[in-house]
Structure formats: C-alpha cells, structure tokens
C-alpha cells in the first residue's frame, strides 16, 4: 500500500545518496531530521537503507582482510 511505497521510496533515495557520496552518518542525520518532523515512514526507509549499507560495509571489510 501507500505506506510501503513511502518506505521504499526513501529506502532507494537513501541508497542513491550513498552512491553519490553520503555515508551512513550523513544519512542518520537526515533520518533524525525526518524523525523530528514526525515523518516516521520516511525514517523507516532511511533506517532500512542504513542497515543495508552497514551490512555491505561489513562484508567489504571481511573480504578485504
């Protein structure tokens, strides 16, 4: 439904921002800004992207060792 659409839109936007050079900390700052505005679905999308990014970075670190 619409709620899932909002979550996934912000998930993909956050991943796009990551590809363009923002790191997980930058995305966290953006997420907290949405949280202050009580836009929780947007927050959830960004949070999911941060979780995925941190997972990818961990795998990359393991592979590089």
Model-assigned labels for residue ranges:
Residues 1-19:
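Short, charge-rich, low-complexity alpha-helical interaction segments
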Residues 7, 32, 41-44:
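N-terminal cationic and glycine-rich segments that engage phosphates or anionic surfaces
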Residues 14-15, 28-32, 48-51:
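Conserved small-residue packing positions in alpha-helical repeats and bundles
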Residues 19-22, 35:
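Hydrophobic/aromatic side-chain positions at a characteristic register within alpha-helices
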Residues 23-26, 54:
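Structural recognition of alpha-solenoid helical scaffolds
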Residues 25-26, 32, 61-63:
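Terminal alpha-helical segments
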Residues 41-64:
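Short, charge-rich amphipathic alpha-helical segments embedded
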């Amino acid at each position: 439904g619409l709620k899932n659409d909002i979550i996934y839109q912000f998930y993909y936007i956050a991943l796009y921002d990551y590809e363009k050079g923002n790191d997980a900390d930058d995305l966290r700052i953006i997420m907290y800004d949405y949280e202050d505005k009580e836009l929780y679905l947007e927050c959830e999308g960004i949070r999911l992207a941060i979780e995925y990014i941190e997972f990818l970075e961990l795998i990359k670190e393991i592979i590089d060792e």
